[in-house]
Amino acid sequence: MNKEKELRAASPSLRHVQDLSSRVWILQNNILTAVPRKEQTVPVTITLLPCQYLDTLETNRGDPTYMGVQRPMSCLFCTKDGEQPVLQLGEGNIMEMYNKKEPVKASLFYHKKSGTTSTFESAAFPGWFIAVCSKGSCPLILTQELGEIFITDFEMIVVH
């Protein structure tokens, strides 16, 4: 597919996300949380759109991507709580960010694919990745500790 055409996405890609232990992302009290997949578990649908302005961002970190939640419509963004970068879910539409004249770094993640897994690094806080704890149910966070206490590799399942 032509990269330029791909950047002019008409609508977001829809995905369910899980870690390699089959813990899926759900929305629980307006917080993105990873929980073990069970028969009744309904994963949240994540929306993804590429950033149109690649020349203003770092290269070789992955594809700059806006991430959101389909219902209720909201978007992921990174901010600071004191000195600590944190992951937040806020009101908004990733289509609006996609259509802005410049990148919205707080809401951009470098999506890097490796085989069947993906990582999501904050564009606003390089070196900080979306992560979940290694066991049980837990909210999504940002971490710099790759593959140690937290899981940063996720599988993306296409939603039709």
Swiss-Prot record:
GO terms for cellular component: cytoplasm; extracellular space. SUPFAM superfamilies: Cytokine (SSF50353). Gene3D superfamilies: 2.80.10.50. Interacts with TMED10; the interaction mediates the translocation from the cytoplasm into the ERGIC (endoplasmic reticulum-Golgi intermediate compartment) and thereby secretion. Highly expressed in embryonic tissue and in tissues containing epithelial cells. Elevated expression levels are detected in chronic kidney disease; expressed inepithelia from the distal convoluted tubules (DCTs) to the cortical collecting ducts (CCDs) in single nephrons (at protein level). Induction: By IL-22 in normal and psoriasis-like skin. One of its GO terms (biological process) is positive regulation of interleukin-6 production. This is Interleukin-36 alpha. Cytokine that binds to and signals through the IL1RL2/IL-36R receptor which in turn activates NF-kappa-B and MAPK signaling pathways in target cells linked to a pro-inflammatory response. Part of the IL-36 signaling system that is thought to be present in epithelial barriers and to take part in local inflammatory response; similar to the IL-1 system with which it shares the coreceptor IL1RAP. Seems to be involved in skin inflammatory response by acting on keratinocytes, dendritic cells and indirectly on T-cells to drive tissue infiltration, cell maturation and cell proliferation. Its main location: cytoplasm. One of its GO terms (molecular function) is cytokine activity. It comes from the Eukaryota. It is found in: Cytoplasm; Secreted.
